[in-house]
Each structure stands twice: as structure tokens, then as C-alpha cells.
Amino acid sequence: GGQGWPAGYRSIAVLQVVLTAILLVSLPLWKGQRTDAGAGEAPDKPLTLREIFRIPGAKEVMIAFFCYSAVEQTTSLWASSYLALHAGFSTEQAAGFASLFFIGITVGRAFSGFLTIRMDDPQIIRLGQGVIAVGIIALLLPLGEFFTLVGLILIGLGCAPVFPCIIHSTPAHFGADRSQAVIGVQMASAYIGTCVMPPLFGLIANHINVAWFPVYLILSLAVMVWMHEMLLKKSGQRLS
């Protein structure tokens, strides 16, 4: 509205304060969700990597985390390039509109705690995956600039609950005595996905076409959904 960058910074500051307040209010909702995991004592010695891999569902959750990071980080790093080089936005517009993805994540994380009142972790993860899928489809189909931007917001909203819910559900899937070790390899998988998958898409964008961006995301999402469903099956946590 012609007020310049100081007004923009003030608006962002107000938004951050509001979202922080919402996050603080929602914290008890996350803590209030009980799990049926065994409350075993921590093992006397740490599990080796080989022992962790032998736990039913461990490999699946690692791949799911890897693919989640692929979706989130590839979107965060390449959305602006996709908007500028394929969707028809100017460089300045693309740089600004790419932030809609982060707004989606921030708002989604703020409200994720409230979802636990009605839903458990697998349900919330599935909901997030569904929202991500809708967002990617909005990017993939030639629906116009408006729906492209809506797609970025939806991808952010869908990503928001997946990471915390996978972590939160770890004791339920693997038991309290194994959860610390499994969370460690989950985080390692997430970091590997962050380091590997965005540069891999960079090669695709440079040598083929940046238009493959939504296809790359939907393939990563498909593997994540598959691995999460396999995890639920192996851990006996299938939803009725």
C-alpha cells in the first residue's frame, strides 16, 4: 500500500507475536495426548545402528522422514525459481510469493496442536499429506497464477504437522525404551534428505526443466505416504 519496508517489518513482527501466543496456548494440547507405548526403562546400553534397523518399522520411518525433508526443503529452496522460470512471475514477484510456503508452515504449526483434540498422530499426518497433495496438484495443473500461489500455501499447511507428529508418535510405534534411538536416526534421515534432495532437483532443473518441480514433489510425497502406511502396518497402529 505504498507504506514501504518499515510497515512490512512491523506487520511481520505483529504476525510473529500472534503466532507465538497461539503456539504457547496450544502446547498443553500436545502434552495432553496420551500414547499406549510401553513405559519401559531406558536400556542399559545404547542400541547400535544395526539393532535399530532391525526394529520393525524403523527403516520405513527413516525413509518417510527423508521424503518429508525432500518435500519441505525442495519447496523452500526452489519455489521462487519455479514461479519465475515457469509460472510467469517476475523475479521480484517470485521472491516475494515464495514466502507464502513459509507462511503456510508457520500458521499450520500454530494450529496443529488444536487438531490433537479430535485426531491422533496418524490421522493428522494423513491429513497433512492430503493437503500437500492438493497443493502440489494446484501447481501441476494449468489453473492460473492464483491457484499456483494457493498451492504453495497448501503445501506449507500440509507440511506443518507432519514433522512434529512423526516425532510425537515415535514412542507409540517403537516403545519408550527405543524411542530415543529411533528419533536419532529419524533426524539423521531428515538431515540427509535436506542435503541431498534439493541439490538433486537442481540438477533436474538445470539439465532438463524446472517445470518438473511439482512432479518431483509428488513422487517424494508418494514414497512418504507409502512408507508411513507401511510403518503403521508394521507397528500395528492401523486406523479403523
Specify the residue positions occupied by each region the protein language model found.
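Symmetry-related core transmembrane helices of the 12-TM Major Facilitator Superfamily/SLC fold
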Residues: 7-26, 214-230
